[in-house]
């Protein structure tokens, strides 16, 4: 189907996510024509790609502004997957850094305040030396150096509770915009109709 100038072509891409699609392109400036095969993606996939790009940009900003002294992690949600990504990053590619920026902005919550408190409250008690060379600090599975946490108005539920615990325990400074105080605890219940799930505040 030809797409006329000014025509909305989005409807042509509906319901073909993941399907290889032939697109014929015409360049009026020089009269050239060519074909490209593309694979449309869903809105969800697009959002994921945009999020990953945003995180990379923030990490690059922190590296540039700190001269490579600080690392950067964003906690997308207070859930296992986000924790594993953060854990791998801080003890992996950022292990050499002097400090870490923990970004919790736009986090919708979950339950991870205790895990984050434990992870970032490490205190060095020895340095392991192997054959005269320093190998690692202990504890080796917690962050023993400086950290700072960023918040914003879009933090919700446990993304309010986590910065509160971080500040209450004196782990580091909390900076950014105020969190609206939305910390809640919810019990998820199913009744006779198992397709219905109710979040009951406790």
Where are these regions (language model features)?
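Cleft-lining beta-strand/loop regions that shape enzyme active-site pockets
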Residues: 2-197
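Short, intrinsically disordered, charge-balanced linker/junction segments flanking boundaries
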Residues: 200-202
């Amino acid at each position: 189907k030809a797409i006329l100038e000014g025509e909305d072509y989005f409807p042509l891409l509906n319901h073909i996510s993941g399907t290889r699609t032939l697109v014929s392109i015409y360049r009026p400036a020089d009269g050239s024509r060519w074909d490209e095969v593309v694979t449309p993606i869903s809105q969800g996939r697009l959002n994921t790609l945009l999020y990953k790009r945003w995180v990379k940009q923030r990490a690059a900003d922190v590296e540039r502004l700190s001269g490579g002294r600080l690392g950067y992690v964003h906690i997308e949600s207070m859930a296992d997957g986000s924790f594993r990504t953060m854990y791998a990053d801080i003890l992996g590619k950022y292990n050499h850094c002097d400090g870490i920026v923990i970004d919790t902005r736009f986090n919708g919550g979950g339950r991870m305040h205790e895990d984050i408190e434990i992870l970032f409250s490490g205190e060095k008690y020895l340095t392991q030396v192997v054959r005269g060379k320093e190998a690692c600090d202990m504890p080796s599975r917690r962050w023993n150096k400086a950290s700072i946490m960023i918040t914003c108005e879009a933090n919700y539920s446990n993304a309010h509770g986590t910065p509160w615990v971080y500040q209450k325990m004196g782990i580091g400074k909390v900076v950014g915009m105020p969190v609206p105080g939305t910390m809640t605890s919810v019990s998820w219940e199913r009744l006779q109709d198992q397709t219905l799930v109710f979040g009951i505040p406790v």
